[in-house]
Amino acid sequence: MESSKKMDAAGTLQPNPPLKLQPDRGAGSVLVPEQGGYKEKFVKTVEDKYKCEKCRLVLCNPKQTECGHRFCESCMAALLSSSSPKCTACQESIIKDKVFKDNCCKREILALQVYCRNEGRGCAEQLTLGHLLVHLKNECQFEELPCLRADCKEKVLRKDLRDHVEKACKYREATCSHCKSQVPMIKLQKHEDTDCPCVVVSCPHKCSVQTLLRSELSAHLSECVNAPSTCSFKRYGCVFQGTNQQIKAHEASSAVQHVNLLKEWSNSLEKKVSLLQNESVEKNKSIQSLHNQICSFEIEIERQKEMLRNNESKILHLQRVIDSQAEKLKELDKEIRPFRQNWEEADSMKSSVESLQNRVTELESVDKSAGQAARNTGLLESQLSRHDQMLSVHDIRLADMDLRFQVLETASYNGVLIWKIRDYKRRKQEAVMGKTLSLYSQPFYTGYFGYKMCARVYLNGDGMGKGTHLSLFFVIMRGEYDALLPWPFKQKVTLMLMDQGSSRRHLGDAFKPDPNSSSFKKPTGEMNIASGCPVFVAQTVLENGTYIKDDTIFIKVIVDTSDLPDP
């Protein structure tokens, strides 16, 4: 069987190297359709066990499910891409990890006999499916192949390729009858008409020389007596053309005309010089304007540098403030340590009290008429009373220090509050029962010397939202540096309920303070009247979404500090 050929540099046909195949990740090199099963024409009717349960074509790279049904690899990938894949044959759920390659079935399918794809062009071959690609790539004489010449775009059957390349291809090499050079057949006529140096041509100026080679034409034109020429005063406006003899006669007889042309050209040149001078003046003005702009830019740059230096000094000041706060935290930690020790002592005292109470109980069971027992009981009761008083004092001091430490630990100084509310169900039930209608957050600040604020929430709603919504409010508190801040409060406020799910669909509302509202005046008490949203979010939305996790919700308050001046 004749293989395909290719041309070498001299135009001779050479054996064509074997074409590279696309290996399938299995046995051999086979045709793999992009989607679904094989569409080949099989010699015998294919059994149903070799057909895909989805596309009903012959299986390509068969995969078998746990339920025993087979699918093409691409069809299985399409099924597994759905959220709940099911077998199209029995509707059983498909588990990806339990789908496996059916290599036995694959080998049986590749051994099935098929007709060549070029049967319609005359190929009568019957071969196994696994050998079809090799047959089409290297053997089939009825496979269409591109011409071996790079410029030719025609496709011919493999059996006709040699004749096409040698006899019919428009880009085959042909020999010029004049210069004997090799030229593609499609370009031969153009070569002879315009390019061949050995073709005989005549002078285009119809001089006495009638025949000469195209290669000699250029040299002849430079010497031809009939070659047209122009007057040497052409650049000044003279349009006369003629032979060399006519040009000499013209220049001798037209001296006055040429002088006039020179005068006109000189006048035109003077006008151009004047225009250039005017343009030069305008350019100088533009240069001066640019110089002034550069000076103003330099002044602005110096001003920006000064602002930068001021900002650096502010940053240093803030760093010192931060260091000071860190020192205060360390001091607070030192102050808390004794209270921790007191707490441990209190625990010890509690055990002592319990022991004393046990002793009192024992003594009370003894004969109450015994005088000594009565005195001992009175002494023990007085000791017990003193211990209870000391424990109460310790409890109060520890609670106060714990509260102060929590406030300092959770305070934010950038205008952003993230408030974590635990035990949502219990706290909401207390609100429903009227025990604790609202909760206040820890304070937060717009800066170390800025506004002091907090949030207030009604878990069972307030006003219009009572019993149906969560109500959320913003509160201005009296701060240490209120005297240095601008009033009324004007910063934009954003209230937000945070979504704890992966979609992060937070619920939020924003408002600009009303300068006439008493809620945003300078506080005269501990805090102003709260302002916000009585119907911030419906309780059904809150409790049925992903806003509650581990019986906890998160509320976020953002105060815009971008235009806030330093105190």
From Swiss-Prot:
Alphabetical list of CDD domains matching this protein: MATH_TRAF3 (cd03777), RING-HC_TRAF3 (cd16640)
Residue ranges that the Swiss-Prot or TrEMBL entry lists as coiled coil: 266-337
Zn finger limits (RING-type): 67-76
Tissue expression profile of the protein: Detected in bone marrow macrophages and spleen B-cells (at protein level). In adult, highest in brain. Also found in kidney, heart, thymus, spleen, lung, muscle, testis and ovary. Not found in liver.
One matching Pfam family: zf-TRAF
Annotated segments matching region Disordered: 1-26
Observed effect of gene inactivation: Newborns appear normal, but do not thrive. Their blood glucose levels and leukocyte levels decrease steadily, the spleen size is dramatically reduced, and they become progressively runted. They die about ten days after birth. Mice exhibit abnormally high MAP3K14 protein levels and constitutive proteolytic processing of NFKB2/p100, leading to constitutive activation of NF-kappa-B.
Any one biological process term the GO annotation gives: regulation of cytokine production
Record GO terms (molecular function): identical protein binding; protein kinase binding; protein phosphatase binding; thioesterase binding; tumor necrosis factor receptor binding; ubiquitin protein ligase activity; ubiquitin protein ligase binding; zinc ion binding
Annotated phenotype, changing K328R: Abolished ubiquitination by the SCF(FBXL2) complex
Protein name: TNF receptor-associated factor 3
Species of provenance: Mus musculus
Gene from which this protein is expressed: Traf3
